[in-house]
Structure formats: C-alpha cells, structure tokens
Regions:
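Conserved small/polar residues in nucleotide/adenosyl-binding loops
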Residues: 198-205
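Short, well-ordered coil/turn segments that N-cap beta-strands
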Residues: 53, 103-105, 137-139, 160
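Short Fe-S-cluster ligation motifs
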Residues: 98-110
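Canonical radical SAM enzyme core domain
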Residues: 80-92, 119-126, 130-157, 163, ...
C-alpha cells in the first residue's frame, strides 16, 4: 500500500530526531529580488523541543531505508521499524508549503544510506536544486554529508547548503569496525576538507541561480 505524504513525514521526522543540528548557521544573506526567504547570522533556530530538535527547522531524513547495519543506529538495516522514502519533489514541495505557512525557517536534511552514499547524495542534491533553483528558496539549509560520498558530489552539496556537517560516531578505528562494519575511518573524515572549501565558494554560485 502506497504511503501518504503525512505518513512519510511522520516516519522520517521521527527517524531524524537523533541527528544533531547546530542552531547557528554561521551565514548572513539578505533576500534577493524574486527570492523567498533570507538567512541571517547567528542562525534561524532558537527554539527546541524536549528531544533536542530545533522547532523552526523542518528536520527530516530523505529516507530511513539503509544499506548499512551500524549497531548504534536506530535506522540500521536489521532493525524492524516502519520505512519510508521521500521523492525529491515531495520533500521540496513540503518544505516550501511549511515555509509559506510560517511553520519553519529552513530545512535540516540528512539521510540513511539508500543503495550507496553517492546515490543518496544525488537525491539530496535534487531536493536542494529544486528549492534553490525552481522555488527560489533563500532560507537556511543544513545538509548532512554522507560518509563515502565522492568529493565532486560533496562540492555540489556545498554550493547549495548554508551549512554542511558530517557525523563522527566513534573515537577509534577498532571501535568503528566493531559497531559499524560497513563504514571506514577514511570515509568519515574525508568529507571534512571539501566541506570547508565548498563553503567559501557557495555564496558566489548562489548568485547565479
């Protein structure tokens, strides 16, 4: 049976509640003519729910269907829980609808690893391209980099998001191999260099969208 948009939102918002979102964007950008929304430092998130979610962001996963089986993660493939996946169009339209109703000030987007890191990031990029390009969304976007994603895709993600971050789950390579056998130390740390580089170039690129 096909899931409704509300069913997907309920599942994927709940699955995102353990992902850490910073409340300060570090970005300052006024609205441009013809765009919707703006982004001002020190960020657009100031109210929190009891479980740590920032209530002025739509904090959601692209999907909670994961190819990995990390023992600490609620979305691991061996866990028996409801699964859902947004299409890029569904999530972009949902974000805009919430924004127009003044429910949110921006989007926090993360994802489980569907098929592969690159495939997952391509779908996240499709959402951001719709928001920035077709819908002229100028609000705050925080995207989570998926470990193992190619540098080229991370660079594109950096052009479109105000903030990029990556989860570093464990302090040692031995612990990582025990608890997250599908991940490697280098796949986690590798995204950090492109993140800092792409941030410097992102705002210039956005001017031409």
């Amino acid at each position: 049976m096909e899931q409704s948009l509300m069913e997907k939102l309920t599942i994927l918002a709940d699955s995102a509640k353990y992902d850490v979102a910073c409340t300060s964007s570090g970005a300052s950008r006024a609205a441009r003519a013809g765009s919707i929304g703006s982004c001002y430092a020190p960020g657009c998130c100031h109210a929190f729910t009891a479980d740590g979610r920032c209530v002025s962001l739509l904090k959601v996963l692209m999907t909670n269907c994961c190819s990995f089986d990390c023992s600490y993660c609620v979305n691991r493939k061996s866990n028996d829980l409801p699964r859902a996946t947004f299409s890029p169009r569904e999530l972009a339209e949902l974000t805009m609808e919430f924004y127009r109703r003044n429910y949110i000030e921006g989007l926090f987007l993360s994802s489980a690893v569907l098929v592969s890191p690159d495939y997952t990031t391509e779908r996240m990029l499709a959402v951001l391209r719709l928001l920035r390009g077709q819908y002229h969304f100028g609000g705050y976007i925080h995207a989570k980099a998926i470990p193992g994603t190619s540098p080229e895709l991370l660079e594109q993600l950096g052009y479109l998001a105000d903030r990029l971050s990556v989860n570093i789950e464990l302090p040692s390579e031995k612990s990582l191999s025990l608890l997250a056998p599908d991940k490697g130390r280098h796949s986690i740390f590798r995204p950090m260099k492109p993140v800092s580089y792409t941030h410097l170039r992102a705002h210039e690129t956005l001017r031409h969208l």
